[in-house]
From Swiss-Prot:
InterPro entries: POLYCHOME/GIG1
Record-linked PANTHER family: PROTEIN GIGAS CELL1 (PTHR35119:SF13), PROTEIN POLYCHOME (PTHR35119)
Name listed for the protein in its UniProt record: Protein GIGAS CELL1
Tissue expression notes: Expressed in rapidly dividing tissues such as shoot apical meristem and young leaves. Associated with cell division but also with specific cell types.
Post-translational modification as stated in the protein's UniProt record: Phosphorylated by CDKA-1 in complex with CYCA1-2.
Oligomeric form and interacting partners: Interacts with APC/C activators such as FZR1, FZR2, FZR3, CDC20.1 and CDC20.5.
The species this protein was found in: Arabidopsis thaliana (Mouse-ear cress)
Cellular component annotations (GO), alphabetically ordered: nucleus
GO biological process, alphabetically ordered: cell division; defense response; DNA replication; endomitotic cell cycle; endosperm development; megagametogenesis; meiosis I; meiosis II
Effect of loss of the gene: Ectopic endomitosis during somatic cell division leading to gigas cells, large guard cells, and round cells containing large polyploid nuclei in cotyledons. Enhancer of the myb3r4 mutant phenotype. Enhancer of bon1-2 phenotype, leading to dwarf and bushy phenotype with many lateral shoots. Production of diploid gametes by skipping the second meiotic division; male meiosis leads to dyads instead of tetrads, and selfed progeny provides tetraploids (4n) and triploids (3n), but no diploid (2n) plants.
Coiled-coil residues: none
Gene: GIG1
Amino acid sequence: MPEARDRTERPVDYSTIFANRRRHGILLDEPDSRLSLIESPVNPDIGSIGGTGGLVRGNFTTWRPGNGRGGHTPFRLPQGRENMPIVTARRGRGGGLLPSWYPRTPLRDITHIVRAIERRRGAGTGGDDGRVIEIPTHRQVGVLESPVPLSGEHKCSMVTPGPSVGFKRSCPPSTAKVQKMLLDITKEIAEEEAGFITPEKKLLNSIDKVEKIVMAEIQKLKSTPQAKREEREKRVRTLMTMR
C-alpha cells in the first residue's frame, strides 16, 4: 500500500520559501512535522496545491465553530506588506468593555421627564391654580437672570411653616414667644400677598423681623436676675484663674 501523502517527507528550501513570502505576501504550508498538537490544521483548497515547496495559491480557511459559511472563515494577508498581524472581522461594534448585547443608545434629553416630575410635585403641594412649574432651558437663562419677576413667583412660600396640630413640645416660654411671633409674621405675609411682592423682598422682610424679635428676647433674658447671677459667677471664675 502506498504511503499516505501527509507522511511523505519533502525537502524544504527555506530561502525559496522566504523569497516567495516576501514577493507574494501569501501564507505558506509548513511541513506537518512542525505543526504542534495545539495548533489547528490548515485546510488548503483542492487543486490549489502546487508541485513545488507546498505553496498554496488560493485562500486559506480555518475551521471556526458556529459559522454560517460551512464552518470556514477565509482570510488573506495584505499584499506588499511585511510583519503585519492578521486582522479578522469582528461581529461586535468595537473593542469596548461592554458586551455586544448591552444597549448602546445615545444620550437623550430628559427635560420633558424632569418637567413631568416637577409638574406632579407642584400639583401635590400648591398647584391648585393650575400653574405649571417648568425647568429653564439654555435659551431661558438670560430671561431668568433679568430682574423682572417671572409669573408664579409671588406664590412661592419662603417662610417657616407653623407647628403641626395635635403635637405638643416642652419648650421654654421665650421659644414659645418666638414661635408665636413667627406665626404672626406668616399671617402678615399672607395678608400682603394681595400686593405684588417678590420672594426675595419677602425673605428679607422676614429676616429683619425675626432678627429684631430675637435680639429683643436676648436683651430680656440678660436683664433677669438669674442671667445677672450667671454673669457675675463667670467674672469671678475669670478673676480666680488670673491669680
